[in-house]
A protein has these predicted regions:
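Expand to "…catalyze enediolate/carbanion chemistry for C-C bond making/breaking, isomerization
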Residues: 1-260
């Protein structure tokens, strides 16, 4: 029995950077292959702000199998059934939004790990272990080792407790939720505001102090360059429906400008 590994987690653990796509709209059969063709190392499927359900997530994770791309899911919240089910259907990583305390972060880790380290219910020979048998203790160790756990810092409460959250064993990545954080701070969309700039610096410093990774969704070159300069190491690029819309708008504009 050999389980799939998680090269994104390995890259980050080795001090490298990881680049991928965050998918909000187009959960189509060809999407994972398109991401691979574009050079994405992971596909992060959003369940927080979309209608994505577990059956479709399971299909997307299956489509990623064998393509060399790591499937992950952002679940709606930190409840056990969201985290455990996302992993059971084949996600190799889970992002949890609006993590506010170290206790919540520890709860997330517990939901993702089997006893005695956690509380995840056991079901083997399913999607998450590629429908294989094998030595159960070895399988559990492999599943724990490959699972990437991401806590989003996007509230004043999360920012206030960011050092404690970063220090929780088993949390691998802190992902900056930039829009929600500015909303929570009372400065919606003010990404140049001194308080927001200081908040970002605090999140990155907490990651560096705890040996964790800071992550970010970049939508333009300016924000990407700024994040790289600050020390972020995990990136998703773009919002799929907006990228299609912008490309289509540009193409239609080009066509309308052509005259015989």
């Amino acid at each position: 029995m050999t389980l799939r590994d998680n090269p994104v987690k390995a890259t980050l653990a080795g001090g490298g950077r990881a680049f991928g796509a965050m998918v909000f709209e187009f959960f189509t059969p060809g999407l994972p292959q398109l991401c691979v063709n574009a050079g994405a190392e992971f596909a992060l499927f959003d369940m927080e702000h979309t209608g994505l359900g577990f059956e479709t997530l399971k299909t997307q994770c299956a489509l990623c199998r064998g393509l060399g791309i790591v499937p992950m899911a952002r679940v709606p919240r930190s409840e056990y059934h969201f985290i455990a089910r996302a992993l059971d259907v084949g996600a190799l990583g889970v992002m949890v939004p609006m993590v506010g305390t170290a206790d919540e972060a520890a709860h997330i880790v517990s939901c993702a790990r089997y006893p005695p380290q956690g509380r995840r219910g056991a079901a083997f020979g399913f999607a998450h272990d590629d429908y294989q048998g094998g030595n159960v203790p070895e399988k559990i160790a492999a599943l724990h080792a490959r699972t990437l756990l991401i806590a989003q810092i996007e509230t004043v409460e999360g920012l206030r407790n960011v050092e404690a959250i970063a220090a929780v064993p088993g949390i691998d990545v802190l992902w900056l939720g930039h829009f929600d954080l500015t909303n929570s701070m009372g400065i919606p969309g003010a990404f140049d505001h001194p308080d927001y700039v200081a908040a970002v610096a605090r999140i990155v410093a907490a990651c560096e102090q705890a040996g964790k990774v800071a992550a970010f969704l970049a939508t333009d070159e300016r924000s990407a360059r700024d994040a790289v300069a600050r020390g972020f190491r995990m990136f998703a690029y773009g919002i799929d429906q907006l990228m299609l819309q912008e490309a289509l708008r540009a193409g239609l504009s080009m066509l309308r400008e052509i005259r015989r």
